[in-house]
Regions:
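Noncatalytic, solvent-exposed loop/strand surfaces
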Residues: 1-178
């Protein structure tokens, strides 16, 4: 963690990651972007799962193992956790058992886990989209864009896209998803 006013380090955490899978340069095992609610920082690493750290001192608050993703290509994991209210969402689309998961930010308990059996390896981070008075959790992957109920994980809608492997996240502006 870095002090935004001075640029000086506040604290640093290192993790024992175990054996890291091979990835193609210039990719990194730290490709995911952390999320923070101002009290906690949530980080994802493919060999650790999601770890919650205290923003003040870096102390580990909880850890949720997600299982190592299985990728046929050596690009490595890149999706990032997303916060909405007191829920943390993460999509692990891999070549064996893709799923979308919701965790309680306070303790890391699983609220729901929705399989995505028609998805192969993907690298997109979910986004929240509010349109027509409803907020959906939207995830791109394997030639589809899908919307889910963020409270239950139920798939609400799907839209076909042109690409099989999607590496970018959807962008939301007003009531439109790009």
């Amino acid at each position: 963690s870095t002090n935004p006013a001075t640029g000086k380090p506040l604290w640093k955490r290192e993790f024992e990651t175990g054996t890291l899978p091979r990835i193609t340069p210039p990719n990194s095992h730290a490709s995911s972007t952390p999320a923070s609610d101002g009290k906690r920082v949530f980080v994802y690493f493919s060999t650790l799962g999601i770890v919650a750290l205290d923003v003040a001192d870096g102390k580990e608050l909880w850890r949720r193992s997600l299982g190592k993703p299985a990728y046929l290509m050596d690009w490595g994991a890149a999706a990032s956790p997303v916060l909405h209210g007191d829920s943390l969402y993460f999509c692990q689309d891999d070549d064996l058992a893709s799923y979308l998961i919701s965790l309680d930010t306070a303790n890391g308990e699983v609220r729901w886990r929705t399989p995505r059996p028609d998805m192969l390896a993907g690298y997109a981070t979910p986004v929240m989209c509010t349109a027509g008075g409803r907020t959906d959790l939207v995830v791109a992957g394997s030639g589809k864009l899908k919307g889910y109920d963020p409270k239950t994980g139920k798939e609400l809608w799907t839209c076909n896209t042109l690409l099989r492997t999607i590496m970018t996240s959807p962008v939301v502006k007003d009531d439109i998803i790009y």
